[in-house]
């Protein structure tokens, strides 16, 4: 099953969901809402250093669980995210974040910043052209492999049917659909 839709760019540019989230808008950290604000600040900073966080787009209520690593790290042993993905040094009191993902079958990058004290900020989705091309190539390979396996199955099925038909042609006994009695034995 492919992880992406056939025309990712078109879906990103034309679907209302993506159009709304591709404009920079207000975001909030949504983790540990039941905890005191100071504890949430600490937990948010620790989560960022670990390469993950939960945010919500305020205007739409869309919640995302983000991972701040290159897309190629999916499923591999993770380390501390690089400054490209979690930048605590660019501006005092803020963290700049970047999270590549596949969202609704489209390769995107979430980019934004969050104020370390208020736990809110601004963010948006961008179309990830490079990853989209990679995923399209993987989907095409999977499609070609499935097509090859289907052809092999159909070829085996056809030769089996031809073999069975040849056996029927050789067996002159009326009402027999199979060959001789030996064909009925389990092998």
Swiss-Prot record:
Coiled coil: none annotated. Residues 139-187 are annotated as: Disordered. It comes from the Eukaryota. Expressed in all tissues tested. Highest level in thymus, but also abundantly expressed in muscle, lung and brain. Transmembrane segments: none annotated. The modification Phosphoserine is found at residues 10, 159. Changing residue 104 to A: Interferes with heterodimerization. Its main location: nucleus. It is found in: Nucleus. InterPro entries: CBF_beta (IPR003417), CBF_bsu_sf (IPR036552). Belongs to the CBF-beta family. PANTHER family: CORE-BINDING FACTOR SUBUNIT BETA, CORE-BINDING FACTOR, BETA SUBUNIT. Forms the heterodimeric complex core-binding factor (CBF) with RUNX family proteins (RUNX1, RUNX2, and RUNX3). RUNX members modulate the transcription of their target genes through recognizing the core consensus binding sequence 5'-TGTGGT-3', or very rarely, 5'-TGCGGT-3', within their regulatory regions via their runt domain, while CBFB is a non-DNA-binding regulatory subunit that allosterically enhances the sequence-specific DNA-binding capacity of RUNX. This is Core-binding factor subunit beta. It comes from Mus musculus.
